[in-house]
Design a protein with these regions (language model features):
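Gram-negative bacterial Sec-dependent N-terminal signal peptides
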Residues: 1-19
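Glycan-recognition patch characteristic of GH18 chitinases/ENGases
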Residues: 21-121, 202-203, 331, 346
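Short, well-ordered coil/turn segments that N-cap beta-strands
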Residues: 23, 49, 85-89, 127-129, ...
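Substrate-binding surface in catalytic domains of secreted glycosidases
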Residues: 26, 30, 62-70, 137-267
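Conserved, mostly hydrophobic/aromatic
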Residues: 51, 91, 133, 186, ...
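Short acidic catalytic loops
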Residues: 52-55, 122-139, 189, 315-320
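Generic structural signal for well-ordered alpha-helices
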Residues: 72-79, 116-123, 147-154, 210-215, ...
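Glycan-binding loop/region signatures in secreted carbohydrate-active enzymes
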Residues: 233-307, 333-350
Length: 351
């Protein structure tokens, strides 16, 4: 580990005891982790309290199926290891391009009941602690159906956890605080803010924009102690721009301009990048001769955890577990944990 990274990591500071409400650390485990050679055995279970498995896909008749059947064995192993490590496994149902199907299900009382019953049975059969309803691109037109679906799930789940994924920056008008308050907690997700369509470089994700999303739901009447903000463990690279406000000329390095956090840490071991923390947005930017990379690193994730703790939010979610660095000194999960769960031993395990 070089001195540059160590100095960058000093932003961790000293951890203090978290408020009682800010006790959840959620890690997302998507089915595509298998293609990144990241298996359930690679999860550092002591770093999280909950794991959200992404995802289970619904059909319009209320039945359920794995989004990728190649991941069934991985899911079984995930369920086994989560139970052994006393981590709650939450199954995400819905997700990308599933809003049409969820709307069809919600429109029929009979199908809603079938769907909710199937979800409850799936949880029982697979040892899962609960479900996350992930209805993306929700519109005001579907708000009534969304509420009916939430109520059907709540009735069917009994004592199991109901979580809801919310996207307030794109669907604020569709949410009702009284509906979201039916959930044990609400994961607050923010879409990418910097894309190829933007004419000027800006943060892709930041504490500032996450706080905007949290405030939007609070204004809707959602209980603060139920709100759980999520952040992405990847950065986005753009050619040409040498800082915020400059015009990029195209996508930079990485897989279509996307670099996982652990890939970024490898890049920053060289002197090619100047990494700095932007106080206004509470996000990071790395600038080289060829490109700029916008991301959330240790200082911004620490600031997010501090916000959660000081405001009494439910916790923090990381999307996704495969992208973090495993060295404790640069791990973002450790950064969260030192703020919210300081009693945990975050030292690297001896091999």
């Amino acid at each position: 580990m070089n001195l540059k990274l160590i100095a960058f990591s000093l932003a961790l500071g000293l951890a203090t005891v978290a408020n009682a409400a800010a006790d959840k650390v959620v890690g997302y485990f998507p089915y595509w982790s298998q293609y990144a050679q990241f298996a359930p055995k690679d999860i550092r279970f002591n770093m999280v309290t909950h794991i959200h498995y992404v995802s289970i896909a619904p059909s319009s008749d209320g039945s359920l199926a794995f989004a990728d059947e190649n991941d069934i064995e991985n899911f079984k192993e995930l369920s086994k290891l989560a139970a052994e490590n006393n981590v709650k496994l939450i199954v995400s149902v819905g997700g990308i391009e599933q809003e049409g199907t969820l709307a069809e299900i919600a429109a029929s009382e009979e199908v809603r009941g079938t769907f909710a019953s199937n979800v409850a049975s799936f949880l029982d059969e697979n040892g899962a602690a609960g479900v996350e309803l992930d209805w993306q691109n929700l519109t005001a037109e579907n708000a009534e159906g969304f509420a009916a679906l939430v109520n059907a799930l709540k009735d069917a789940l009994g004592g199991k956890t109901l979580s809801i994924a919310a996207y307030p920056l794109t669907s604020a008008d569709a949410y009702d605080g009284s509906v979201l308050n039916n959930a044990e907690y609400v994961t607050v997700l923010v879409p990418d803010q910097m894309t190829e369509e933007n004419s000027e470089l800006k943060p892709n994700q930041s504490v500032a924009v996450i706080e905007e999303a949290l405030n939007a739901l609070s204004a809707k009447g959602v209980d603060k102690e139920k709100l759980l903000p999520a952040f992405s463990l990847y950065g986005k690279s753009f050619m040409g721009a040498k800082g915020f406000g400059e015009a990029p000329t195209g996508v930079g390095s990485g897989n279509e301009g996307i670099l996982t956090y652990k890939e970024l840490m490898k890049k920053f071991e060289t002197p090619d990048y100047k990494v700095s923390f932007d106080e206004a947005s509470k996000s990071e930017i790395a600038v080289s001769e060829m490109e700029s990379i916008v991301f959330m690193g240790i200082p911004s994730v620490k600031a997010l955890a501090e916000l959660v703790k000081s405001e009494g939010y439910a916790g923090v979610a990381a999307y996704d577990l495969s992208q973090d660095h495993t060295e404790p000194i640069v791990s973002l999960l450790v950064t969260i944990g030192l703020e919210l769960r300081p009693d945990v031993d975050y030292k690297a395990k001896k091999k």
